[in-house]
C-alpha cells in the first residue's frame, strides 16, 4: 500500500507554509514529504494573521491545488472576543465555533463531490464536526484521518487549574469540558487518528478505546537544521528559548523561567543572558525584558541564533504532544535542559542526549553546569544530533504516516 500513489485532501484551520511556528512546521514537514509521492489538495482557513497569496504560493510547491478560505474570526481583536463571549452560552467549544465558517463547508462540498480522494486528512480535530461524507458517484467514501497534534482539551484542563490570570482560568474551566466533548467526537468519527507521542496515544485510547491510532512523531529537517561552518560559534553565555509566544504553554514557561529559574543562573554567571525568540509575545512577556533578558520577536532563520546559544532551555509546565523546538535544537547539535513535560515523547536518554530537571533549583543547576563545562555541553549536543538524524527526520515521519494511511485503507477494503 505504501507504494500506491494516493489522492489526499488536507483540511486545516491554518496554512502549512511558510512555516513560522510549531503547528505549521509539522504540517509543512509532513506535507512537503508526502507531496513527493502523492497528489495533495489543500483547503485551508486563512485569518488576518497570514498573507493568503504568500501562503498559497508556498504550499503549491508540494500540492496540486490549494484553496484558501477567509476566516472572519481573527486571532485577536473584537471578533475574537465576541466569539469567546458567545461560546460561554454554547454547548460547543470556542475552538469548534472558531472554524465553523459556512464558506469552508461550501468549498469542501464542492471539492469532495468533484474530485476523488482516498484520504481526507484533518489537521487538528477542530474541523471534525464538518461534513466530509460527500464523494463522486461511483466512487468509495474517502477515509477520514485526523492529526491530533496534541490532546487540546487536556491542555485546557491543565490551564484551568494552574495557568494565567484568574479570569483566564475561569474561562478555561468553562470551556475545557466542551472542548473535550467536541474533540473526542472528532476522534470517534474518524477512521484513524495519528498523534505526536506514545503518551498522547495512551491518553486518547483511555477515552476512546476503539480508536485506530498511530504515532507519527514531530521531526526536523535534519539537513536544514545542522551545524554549519559559517555559523557563529557558541558564545558560552547565551541561553535561548523559542516558540510561538502567544500560546499558553509558552507564556507560562517563559514567565516561570524568568521569575523562578533565571535568578539562580544570573547570580552564578553574571555575564549570562537569555534570548527569547518568537512571534506575538503579549505585554506580560515584554514586561519581563531587561539588560540580560531580551525578546527578539519572530526571526526568519533560527539557525544563527541556535548556533550561538550555549544551551537551549525548555522550562514548560503545560502542554501535550512533542516539542518541535527540542527536535530542531537536537538537529543543530545543541545541549538542551528541559522539564520532563517539555521532553515528553522525545526518545532521548537523559544525561546523555538531554538534561531533565523539574524544579527551579535543579533546572538552574543543570544550566549552570553546562555553562561551566562547555566540553560537556558540546558532547551532549553531538549525541543529540545523532538521535535527531536517526529518529526524527521528516522523511521518516512521513513514511510512518504513509504506513498508517495503508492500515486505514486496508481496514476499509
Which positions does each model-derived feature cover?
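N-terminal subdomain of nucleotide-sugar transferases
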Residues: 1-69, 113
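Donor nucleotide-sugar binding/catalytic pocket of nucleotide-sugar-dependent glycosyltransferases
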Residues: 143, 153, 172-227, 234
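Conserved acidic donor-binding segment of nucleotide-sugar-dependent glycosyltransferases
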Residues: 354-361, 369-374
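A short, well-ordered alpha-helix in the C-terminal region of glycosyltransferases
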Residues: 376-391, 400
Amino acid at each position: 500500500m505504501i507504494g500506491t500513489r494516493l489522492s489526499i485532501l488536507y483540511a486545516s484551520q491554518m496554512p502549512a507554509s511558510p512555516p513560522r511556528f510549531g503547528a505549521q512546521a509539522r504540517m509543512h514537514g509532513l506535507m512537503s514529504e508526502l507531496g513527493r509521492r502523492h497528489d495533495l489538495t489543500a483547503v485551508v482557513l486563512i485569518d488576518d494573521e497570514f498573507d493568503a497569496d504568500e501562503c498559497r504560493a508556498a504550499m503549491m510547491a508540494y500540492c496540486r491545488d490549494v484553496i484558501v478560505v477567509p476566516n472572519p474570526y481573527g486571532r485577536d481583536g473584537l471578533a475574537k472576543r465576541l466569539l469567546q463571549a458567545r461560546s460561554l452560552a454554547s454547548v460547543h467549544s470556542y475552538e469548534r465555533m472558531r472554524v465553523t465558517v459556512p464558506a469552508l463547508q461550501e468549498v469542501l462540498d464542492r471539492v469532495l463531490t468533484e474530485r476523488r480522494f482516498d484520504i481526507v486528512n484533518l489537521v487538528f480535530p477542530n474541523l471534525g464536526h464538518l461534513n466530509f461524507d460527500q464523494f463522486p458517484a461511483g466512487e468509495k467514501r474517502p477515509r477520514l484521518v485526523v492529526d491530533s497534534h496534541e490532546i487540546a482539551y487536556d491542555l485546557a484542563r491543565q490551564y484551568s487549574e494552574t495557568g494565567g490570570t484568574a479570569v483566564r482560568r475561569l474561562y478555561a474551566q468553562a470551556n475545557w469540558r466542551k472542548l473535550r466533548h467536541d474533540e473526542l467526537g472528532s476522534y470517534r468519527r474518524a477512521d484513524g487518528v495519528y498523534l505526536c507521542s506514545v503518551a498522547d496515544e495512551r491518553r486518547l485510547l483511555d477515552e476512546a478505546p476503539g480508536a485506530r491510532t498511530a504515532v507519527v512523531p514531530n521531526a526536523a529537517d535534519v539537513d536544514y537544521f545542522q551545524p554549519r561552518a559559517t555559523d557563529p560559534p557558541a558564545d558560552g553565555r547565551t541561553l535561548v528559548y523559542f516558540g510561538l509566544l502567544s500560546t499558553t504553554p509558552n507564556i507560562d514557561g517563559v514567565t516561570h523561567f524568568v521569575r523562578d529559574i533565571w535568578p539562580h543562573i544570573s547570580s552564578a554567571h553574571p555575564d549570562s543572558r537569555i534570548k527569547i525568540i518568537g512571534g506575538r509575545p503579549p505585554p506580560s512577556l515584554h514586561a519581563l525584558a531587561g539588560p540580560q533578558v531580551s525578546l527578539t520577536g519572530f526571526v526568519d532563520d533560527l539557525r544563527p541564533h541556535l548556533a550561538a546559544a550555549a544551551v537551549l532551555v525548555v522550562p514548560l509546565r503545560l502542554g501535550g504532544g512533542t516539542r518541535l523546538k527540542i527536535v530542531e535544537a537536537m538537529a543543530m547539535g545543541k545541549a538542551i535542559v528541559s522539564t520532563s513535560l517539555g521532553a515528553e515523547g522525545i526518545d532521548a536518554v537523559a544525561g546523555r542526549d538531554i538534561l531533565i530537571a523539574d524544579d527551579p533549583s535543579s533546572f538552574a543547576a543543570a544550566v549552570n553546569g553546562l555553562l561551566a563545562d562547555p566540553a560537556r555541553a558540546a558532547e551532549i549536543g553531538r549525541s543529540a544530533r545523532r538521535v535527531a538524524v536517526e529518529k526524527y527526520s521528516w522523511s521518516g515521519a512521513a513514511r510512518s504516516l504513509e504506513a498508517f494511511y495503508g492500515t486505514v485503507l486496508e481496514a476499509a477494503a
